């Protein structure tokens, strides 16, 4: 039987198929055997340019966008509004976060496509050595500028010139740098020094990321980077890199595994750090090592981040990555719960998601899943959400309109912010579903107090046309959220009461029987009290146990009144008539009279 390779659930490396090749030597920097002529997989113009210019390595042009290019494959979307300012986007995000968002806009917004490509070209040239995307984006920009529809359009950026010198220099140095880093990594690995091996792996990983080689970076980290992390800060850096590269590669399965394992490890480290700090913070004795105000030297070097700060930053990023994952899986209730756990002050300001993004994701998810009472309590009245939405006054107004039943204004704001949300790569696929859920909840909330309502009045109140309202009502009927009839001739909507009449009558009869029984019981008690009849339960007639004699004696004190025993040995309160304890020792004729009275009742 052939041995099967199984994945270790605690291992953050690649799947078993990739781990099996971990012992194989790294491929050479040139990547492709020159004797084999590969089939061009990228742009033919890029291939021809690489053949004409030997300074550009063939492997940099052959495979174009790696996994980042497939992040929105199969997603058909076109936004024909200029809903985002590309310049402000570059200020709000950096590195791979800006790359993903600008690339998504270039694919799905024809109006902003040229501006997005120009920003991407400038970013790649200034901050990376990614020749592949640089050349590809230039070709796409030239194709966009050559279109007839583009002639009357104005650009917000100056069109750059293709820097052939930069392409040749980076193409020539990339191969030698890769060979050098690979040789250094192999040498340290053979020597068995963990710290040196980890540094070599980190250098090679960053080199691949700078060149846009996501697959190579993942394959390198899958060779067991976790085994070489000897300090807490090394492990934290590893988790953050794993999460970022998984998001860039659009590998949501890997992101799920990494975030779950990272969260457990970081929480354990956080608990250990808290216990360590508490043990070290013992109060000093009076007069011994008492802290006084000390003037700080302005020339002294700034202290690096403590382990606690590193852990909190990593936890914030881990939870933010889980928000993206749960949003992708449409678990909207968990999105709200996770956002409330994030310490936004510890989250990097220009990461894949900002505090404002988290506020938008959480607010829309809450509106789509929570009742209005819970929404007011957990979102409107929550300081965390108010802080997240400080820079989004329009969305704050949307939330207020929804909770105050101003549905017309609510739908108006939703229509105005929809294009901007559609150009967000992390929530774009959820916008239509979230808005539909919110719209249905608004319609149901409006119908609740009515049994009959005019469609024209309702359409005006919710800010929809009669046709749109009718379609929305039909969807609610099909999903069995409401039972109603639409009279198109009179333009009236009638709400049907599906409650069973027999069940209602049965409940009424049960209630009446209970009330009658209670009234009879009161009359019986009144008659018994008028006849001076005292009812004794079985519990009171049971013989007392030996250990209860003393307690029983004290129970006969009647709240402090002295009890005297008569000659017959029967205890009775002094000064009270024996009629107080009369039971059924009266004359039989009187008993018959009492029973007849009770029978009449």
Swiss-Prot record:
Naturally occurring in which organism (per UniProt): Caenorhabditis elegans
Family, per entry: Belongs to the CSN1 family.
Name of the gene this protein is made from: csn-1
GO biological processes: cell cycle switching; oogenesis; regulation of oogenesis
Localization terms from the record: Cytoplasm; Nucleus
One Pfam family it belongs to: PCI
Membrane-spanning residues: none
Keywords: Cytoplasm, Developmental protein, Differentiation, Nucleus, Oogenesis, Signalosome
PROSITE patterns: PCI (PS50250)
Function: Essential component of the COP9 signalosome complex (CSN), a complex involved in various cellular and developmental processes. The CSN complex is an essential regulator of the ubiquitin (Ubl) conjugation pathway by mediating the deneddylation of the cullin subunits of the SCF-type E3 ligase complexes, leading to decrease the Ubl ligase activity of SCF. The CSN complex plays an essential role in embryogenesis and oogenesis and is required to regulate microtubule stability in the early embryo.
InterPro entries: PCI_dom, Rpn7/CSN1, Rpn7_N, WH_DNA-bd_sf
Domain PCI: 338-500
Residue numbers spanned by region Disordered: 1-54, 268-294, 535-581
GO terms for cellular component: COP9 signalosome; cytoplasm; nucleus
Record's compositionally biased regions (Acidic residues): 1-10
Protein name: COP9 signalosome complex subunit 1
Compositional bias (Low complexity): 14-24
Assembly notes: Component of the CSN complex, probably composed of csn-1, csn-2, csn-3, csn-4, csn-5, csn-6 and csn-7. Within the complex it probably interacts directly with csn-2, csn-4 and csn-5. May interact with itself. Interacts with rbx-1.
